[in-house]
Amino acid sequence: MSIILRTGLLAWLMLFALNAAAADFTLKDTQGRIHHLTDYRGKWVLVNFWATWCAPCLDELPDLAALYKAHKGADLVVIGVAMEYPSAQVVLDFLKTQPLPYPVVLGDYKIAKQIGPVAALPTSYLFDQTGKLVSSQSGPVTRASVEAFIRSSKFF
């Protein structure tokens, strides 16, 4: 198979995967609440994978908090998924000193598998109002970049 054909096929498969509806995920946050993607129909859902030791992750947390606060109860939900922690207490202690306004899940790669691959931290997945995965990014995201993406979408 030629390189061009393989590259084209890979690009098509990635595009197909990105536009596929996500299977409903089940996430339990640190407050004991259960979150399903289907619970948020009609809203954009940003799932952000991060770690307490990850400097780029920590840098993006204030922007994600501002994004959540600006859209809380309206058109967008943020769910943080803490990854690669030595114990749950490390994350809980972090949240006591640096509380986040949005739900935080104690994650692992089994939980991540429900949403998508996490090859680096931070990684974010954005689902539209119908539950379709419309964007993913390895590396930090900003409030401005998420809002610009949503504004440019025909679904907003």
Give the residues covered by each predicted segment.
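N-terminal signal peptide c-region/cleavage motif recognized by signal peptidases
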Residues: A17-N19
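Short pre-active-site segment immediately N-terminal to redox-active cysteine/selenocysteine motifs
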Residues: K43-V45, F49-W53, A120
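Thiol/disulfide oxidoreductase modules built on the thioredoxin-like
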Residues: D93-P101, L106-R151
